[in-house]
A protein has these predicted regions:
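Internal alpha/beta scaffold segment
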Residues: 1-35
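Charged, compositionally biased interaction regions
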Residues: 25-193
């Protein structure tokens, strides 16, 4: 989400945006990466969420081919640059007009103009293990639901302190569209609230 803002800024300056793609990470980093507004505002470092969950900072290392950081314990790291002004169609190999399924499970329209990354280096551990999340699926939507739950909890607690006891962003709603709330009814007017 944030990378698009940085990519546009670099492109406006006519420069490529150096990036690292880190794969095979510990679960805390995947959880932290799911956080978005309004739970974490723009500019918030989601690696801080991961560090808090694991009770130690996420170690970073300097990339070998780009001037950008990478996650030290990643199994596989792809380093490259998002090229300014270079685009491809998302369905360039299928010509179907459709993309991979969206997070709720339906097929969306293919993006006609995606940025291109020029890969500069790939580094990996010996016998690297790649565990990945490709949605839609329960693992993916459960992770997506964590920041949704936190946002709902924060908003309701601010509006009606002590009313919300628990919240679950159900996987049937992709972790975003269906919330189940447990509330503490304190007065007759709370019925049906």
């Amino acid at each position: 989400r944030h990378i698009e803002v940085f990519r546009k800024k670099a492109e406006e300056a006519g420069k490529p945006l150096p990036v690292t793609i880190n794969m095979g990470l510990d679960p805390a980093i995947y959880i932290g990466a799911c956080f978005e507004a309004p739970t974490t505002p723009f500019g918030y470092n989601e690696l801080g969420v991961a560090g808090a969950l694991r009770q130690q900072p996420v170690e970073l290392v300097q990339g070998v081919a780009v001037k950008e950081k990478a996650i030290a314990r990643a199994e596989i790291i792809i380093e490259g640059e998002l090229l300014p002004g270079v685009r491809v169609r998302e369905d360039q190999h299928t010509n179907t007009g459709h993309a991979m399924p969206e997070f709720p499970g339906y097929c969306g329209e293919a993006n006609p103009s995606l940025p291109v990354i020029k890969v500069k280096a790939v580094t990996m551990r010996n016998h690297a293990i790649l565990q990945t999340l490709v949605g839609p699926g329960e693992e993916h939507t459960t992770l997506a639901g964590l920041p949704t739950e936190a946002s709902i909890r924060n908003a309701v607690e601010e509006a009606i302190p002590g009313f919300l006891q628990n919240v679950y962003a159900h996987t049937a709603g992709g972790g975003k569209f269906l919330g189940i709330l447990q509330v503490k009814k304190r007065q007759p007017s709370d019925e049906g609230r």
